Amino acid sequence: MGLCVAATTGTIVAWIACGTLCFCYTRLIDGRNKKIWLLTLFLLALTGCIYTRTWADAVAVLGMLLLWLAIKVHTDGKYHPTWKDRPDGRYVRSAAPIAVITPFIMPDRCGANILFDESVEITELDRYVRAKRRAGMPSFGMTHAIIAAYVRTVAKYPAVNRFVAGQRIYARDEDIAVCMTVKKEMTKDSPDTVIKVHFHPGDTIQEVYDKFNAAVLSAKDEMENSGVDDAAGILTSTPRLVLRFVVWLVKLLDYFGIAPKFLLELSPFHGSVYLTSMGSLGIKPVYHHLYDFGTVPAFIAFGRKRRAEEVHDGEIVERKYMDLRFNLDERICDGFYYASVIKYFLRLLAHPEILDIPPETIEKDIP
């Protein structure tokens, strides 16, 4: 009886020690406590077990010691992936309690979306586009300007680059993944595919132009052999039950944040924002739904240019506008933050010359 009690006590102590170590470890490497004294005190406490010659606990001490020696403390001041992080995002540990609870109240992205529309006067933007084409960017268009404006907006308001997965909030930090559907030719029978282009918050309009054009050209050249289409083709060739199981399995892995990185990169449903150009189709922008699968928290659609007559200084003047429609996941940031994001985004489109130079500072999201 005494041996059983001793063994049970030793097991409980070992589990408590392991839990304490994990707690100290996560607090140390996620930046909430940058001193090593927590681990040092814990090691001293375990060393006491060896001093008292309680050999049943000595094995646990050795195991804990090996774990302690395996802990890698980073002193470069940068964030390093740790517990609860995903391959495509960092877990936001200091989010407000209401923000943490919200994904449990509204678990689906389509049930947490907000719709917003805005118009931007594009006289200056039109001039800017024409100037860029004359300056050696022959294919420069509104799409490049909108992407660059969004990238610069993330540099100032990084919380808009978050996403919700597995009912947790994650931050992409300096990786901005822009998704867009492209067609090889503007005909109804031409195949289409999805491109995903990665940008950095410090990118200028020139870097955005180069990265986006390279991705579009690559997609059009390899339209018949794109990774997204190949993967979809393999899945659709299987029986429905198999396909349903595969999709369920991918969703399960994605929920727990353990889906392989290559799969997340292939998926058109995982990214920072999805853009769609209705202007190239000659129609007004639509309110496009968000996807419950994946991580994309924002959908931005922009339509054809339109003219409007207005009264200015007692005279009727004609101005050109472009309409934009947003579908946003309200769980990643609050309404005040979103309002600031939209206003800054529109200001950049009204004064696109700002995008020619790198941002003075790149704001960091909360830990």
What are these regions (language model features)?
Residues 3, 9-17, 21-367:
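C-terminal catalytic/motor cores of large multi-domain enzyme assemblies
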